[in-house]
């Protein structure tokens, strides 16, 4: 899992919706998610595969089913990276304001 993988996975609106559904439910199967979405189970499974590759969900076998649960760590890392980037821009903007005034 890397930040580019996380941002790439989150770049698709359907994948974001799948992740939101998994997070809201605690865990879910592709079949359960597809029943609540306007896409097929196969499409949901493909999106879950991408999310799992980015570390955003964790698959767990439960008998014949695979249940997916969200994993918050990659989102936290992405948020921290964006916060650091925002702080750098704030510092540069403050420096620019000081030099202009």
PLM segments and residue spans:
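Amphipathic alpha-helical dimerization/coiled-coil segments
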Residues: 1-4, 23-24, 76-101
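N-terminal helix-turn-helix DNA-binding core of bacterial DNA-binding proteins
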Residues: 2-40, 62-77
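Residues in the helix-turn-helix
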Residues: 14, 43, 50
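Alpha-helical residues within the helix-turn-helix
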Residues: 35, 46, 52-53
